[in-house]
C-alpha cells in the first residue's frame, strides 16, 4: 500500500477527503483460504469488525438476467424456440424503460448461437443481448464477430480458484485476465468482468488491486469496463458491521471507494445457498450497485440465483412504482414454464406459485371475507 496524505474537496460528496491508499497486488506464495471463517467441516462463520459504510443507492437501478446462462447450467437446456419465447416475455416484462436491462447467452453450442441470433433479429433495445466466456483466447474467438456489444468474462478472484482450480499465482491470474480483457477491448467489445467467488477472496490483496487495474485500463482505452461481483457460493452477508470478505455493503463500498468503480459499472450476482439471494441483491442496490443479476424463478446452480420476479417487486418497493414494467407477464412466464417447459413451480413460491395468496386458516378466511386487505399483501 502507498499512502498519500493530500486532502482534496470531493466532487461526489462535497466534503474534504483524504486521498486513499492505493492497494497493490499481494502476490502471496500460499493461498489465503480464510479458514477461521470457512472451516469446511463446520458451518461458515459470520464475523464482525463493526465497520459501517454509508448507504448510497444510485439514481438508476436495474435488473439483468442470466436465465439462458446460469439458468441452463442446472437443468435440461432450453430449446431454441423456448429461449426466443422467453426473451420476448422478458422484453415485455422490462417495459419501455428497460428495467430488465440485459440478458446473457452461452455461445458454445449451435443451439445457443441460433437462439442468440434469432433474438437479435427481433431488434429489441432491451433486454440487451450479451454473452459469457471464460478468460481464454479460444473462448474470445467465439464472440468477437457475432455482433454483440458486451461480453461477460469469467475472472475467478478467490485463492480457492486461483491456486486450487487454475494452479496459478495471483500475479499470473491477473496478467492472464488483463490480456483477454485487452483483446476484447481491441475487438470493439465492452468487457463485463465476473469476479467469481468474491465473498471468499482476499479483498485488499487481490480484488481491489485488480479492479483498480481494470479502471486504469478503462480510462486509457476509453472503453467502459463493468464489474460483476459474484457471490458464487452464497456466502454474502447483508448485516451492517460484518467483516470482509462476506460483507455485501463492504464489497460494494470498497469497489466504489477504493477502486473507483462507478455505480453504473457495478453489478451483483447472488446465489441462494443460505437463503440470502434476494436480501443480498437488494443490499447491493442500497450500497451503490446499479445492477443486480437474476434468473427467472431463481433457477440456477445448486440452490439457484436471485429470482428475477422477486427483484421486480423489490424495485417497486424501493422506487415507489414499476417504472413501466408489466408484472402480468410474470404470471404468463409461470404458466409457460409449467405448460410448455414442464417445470413445476412450488405452490407457495411468492408471486408465482398457485397458492401464493391462498389462505386455508379459518380465522384468516374470516378476515378475508370481511375485508380482503386484512390477509392480502396488496391487490395482486
Region annotations inferred by a language model:
Residues 1-6, 78, 99-104:
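N-terminal amphipathic, basic-rich helices that act as targeting or association modules
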Residues 7-9, 13-69, 321-380:
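A mid-to-C-terminal "edge-of-domain" accessory segment
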Residues 53, 58-63, 75-99, 118-122, ...:
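Alpha/beta enzyme core
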Residues 69, 106-110, 132-136, 156-158, ...:
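Active-site beta-loop-alpha junctions enriched in small/polar residues
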Residues 107-132, 136-142:
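N-terminal active-site wall of soluble small-molecule enzyme domains
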Residues 128-130, 152, 291-294:
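Short hydrophobic alpha-helical runs that function as membrane-insertion/retention elements
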Residues 233-379:
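Catalytic alpha/beta core domains of metabolic enzymes, predominantly
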Amino acid at each position: 500500500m502507498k499512502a498519500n496524505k493530500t486532502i482534496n474537496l470531493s466532487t461526489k460528496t462535497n466534503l474534504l477527503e483524504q486521498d486513499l491508499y492505493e492497494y497493490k497486488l499481494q502476490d502471496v506464495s500460499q493461498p489465503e483460504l480464510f479458514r477461521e471463517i470457512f472451516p469446511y467441516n463446520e458451518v461458515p462463520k459470520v464475523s464482525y469488525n463493526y465497520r459501517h459504510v454509508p448507504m448510497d443507492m444510485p439514481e438508476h437501478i436495474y435488473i439483468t438476467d442470466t436465465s439462458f446462462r446460469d439458468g441452463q447450467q442446472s437443468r435440461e437446456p432450453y430449446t431454441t424456440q423456448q429461449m426466443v419465447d422467453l426473451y420476448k416475455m422478458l422484453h415485455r416484462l422490462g417495459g419501455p424503460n428497460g428495467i430488465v436491462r440485459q440478458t446473457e447467452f452461452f455461445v458454445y453450442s449451435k443451439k445457443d448461437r441460433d437462439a442468440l441470433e434469432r433474438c437479435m433479429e427481433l431488434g429489441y433495445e432491451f433486454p440487451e443481448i450479451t454473452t459469457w466466456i471464460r478468460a481464454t483466447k479460444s473462448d474470445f474467438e467465439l464472440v468477437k464477430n457475432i455482433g454483440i456489444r458486451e461480453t461477460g468474462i469469467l475472472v475467478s478472484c478467490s485463492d480457492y480458484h486461483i491456486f486450487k482450480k487454475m494452479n496459478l499465482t495471483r500475479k499470473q491470474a491477473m496478467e492472464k485476465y488483463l490480456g483477454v480483457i485487452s483483446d476484447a477491448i481491441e475487438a470493439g467489445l465492452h468487457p463485463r468482468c465476473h469476479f467469481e467467488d468474491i465473498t471468499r477472496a482476499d479483498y485488499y490483496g487481490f480484488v481491489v488491486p485488480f479492479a483498480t487495474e481494470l479502471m486504469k485500463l478503462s480510462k486509457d482505452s476509453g472503453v467502459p469496463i463493468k464489474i460483476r461481483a459474484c457471490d458464487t457460493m452464497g456466502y454474502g452477508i447483508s448485516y451492517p458491521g460484518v467483516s470482509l470478505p462476506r460483507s455485501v455493503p463492504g464489497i460494494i463500498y470498497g469497489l466504489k471507494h477504493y477502486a473507483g468503480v462507478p455505480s453504473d459499472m457495478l453489478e451483483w450476482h447472488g446465489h441462494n445457498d443460505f437463503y440470502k439471494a434476494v436480501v443480498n441483491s437488494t443490499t447491493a442496490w442500497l450500497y451503490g450497485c446499479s445492477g443486480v443479476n437474476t434468473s427467472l424463478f431463481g433457477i440456477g446452480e445448486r440452490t439457484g440465483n436471485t429470482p428475477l420476479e422477486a427483484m421486480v417487486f423489490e424495485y417497486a418497493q424501493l422506487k415507489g412504482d414499476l417504472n413501466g414494467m408489466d408484472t402480468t407477464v410474470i404470471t404468463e412466464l409461470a404458466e409457460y414454464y409449467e405448460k410448455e417447459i414442464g417445470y413445476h413451480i412450488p405452490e407457495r413460491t411468492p408471486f408465482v406459485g398457485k397458492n401464493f395468496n391462498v389462505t386455508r386458516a379459518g380465522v384468516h378466511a374470516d378476515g378475508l371475507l370481511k375485508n380482503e386487505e386484512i390477509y392480502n399483501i396488496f391487490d395482486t
